[in-house]
Amino acid sequence: MAPSQLPAIFNPTSQDIEQLLAAQCHLGSKNLQVHMEPYLWKTRPDGINVINIGKTWEKIVLAARIIAAIDNPADICVISARPYGQRAVLKFAAHTGAVAIAGRFTPGNFTNYITRSFKEPRLIIVTDPRTDAQAIKEASYVNIPVIALCDTDSPTEFVDVAIPTNNKGRHSIGLVWWMLAREVLRLRGSIASREAEWDTMVDLYFYRDPEAEENKDAIEEAKAPGADEVGAAAVDQGFAGTGDWEVSGATAGAFTAASNTAAAGGASWDAAEPSDWAATPAAAGQEWAASGATEQW
């Protein structure tokens, strides 16, 4: 890493450098744009251009100082048409008070004052100059400064401050936005000191696929306790739970005994039925005969 041109208070810690390397912020593309040559460290044998992490940190601090110099945070617009940066810009806007445009940038946001989405920001920050080219083009029409996360092959036309980093990976994009938000909060005084840790985890800025999260939840529900015993595992184990079947057999025996008792009860009803019904008509016939004789007399 090249010697830093920043005051000692802005020097990165070893943890910051480790995070940048772990998120692969130093890995660029195989193509190199001429204006990104000052940020190049070296080129690997496989053709990948390696970015100087020291330059990345210097530009993060410079961009944070520019952002902190704007009095009204709502005058800052953060933009990301790339899906990997949409969650990051939304979290950055929530923590710093900026206005986020996540997704497609509507043409005319900065130039057509008739539209409802018309904005007049004092500064815009984009995730990728290539995918956010429309926003940068309109900002150049109305003289809005632009801060951009630039890879080695990113066009730097109309970009005022380029933060050299890998702007194609979900972890690298999230980490740079997280570090930028942390530096802004430190300069504003929201974080007590530079030695104090920010309580917001960097994972909050990482992109998450909604479908993958739903599939993950479904898999966790399928792995509920006891689910394996009635699934394929039970077949592999040869239905080891024969004790349950024996208990069921005992229960079936109880049902058999109950049915035998019911059959015995049916036999007693059959035996009692003819005697009772045979005796009743006879008695009834005698009574009617007696009453008829009485009426005749």
From Swiss-Prot:
The gene is rps0. It is found in: Cytoplasm. It comes from Sclerotinia sclerotiorum (strain ATCC 18683 / 1980 / Ss-1). Signal peptide: none annotated. It comes from the Eukaryota. GO terms for molecular function: structural constituent of ribosome. Residues 266-297 are annotated as: Disordered. Keywords: Cytoplasm, Ribonucleoprotein, Ribosomal protein. One of its GO terms (cellular component) is cytosolic small ribosomal subunit. The keyword Cytoplasm applies. Residues 282-297 have a biased composition (Low complexity). The keyword Coiled coil does not apply. This is Small ribosomal subunit protein uS2. PROSITE patterns: RIBOSOMAL_S2_2 (PS00963). InterPro entries: Ribosomal_uS2, Ribosomal_uS2_C, Ribosomal_uS2_CS, Ribosomal_uS2_euk, Ribosomal_uS2_euk/arc, Ribosomal_uS2_flav_dom_sf. Belongs to the universal ribosomal protein uS2 family. Required for the assembly and/or stability of the 40S ribosomal subunit. Required for the processing of the 20S rRNA-precursor to mature 18S rRNA in a late step of the maturation of 40S ribosomal subunits. Pfam families: 40S_SA_C, Ribosomal_S2. GO terms for biological process: cytoplasmic translation; ribosomal small subunit assembly. Component of the small ribosomal subunit. Mature ribosomes consist of a small (40S) and a large (60S) subunit. The 40S subunit contains about 33 different proteins and 1 molecule of RNA (18S). The 60S subunit contains about 49 different proteins and 3 molecules of RNA (25S, 5.8S and 5S). Interacts with rps21.
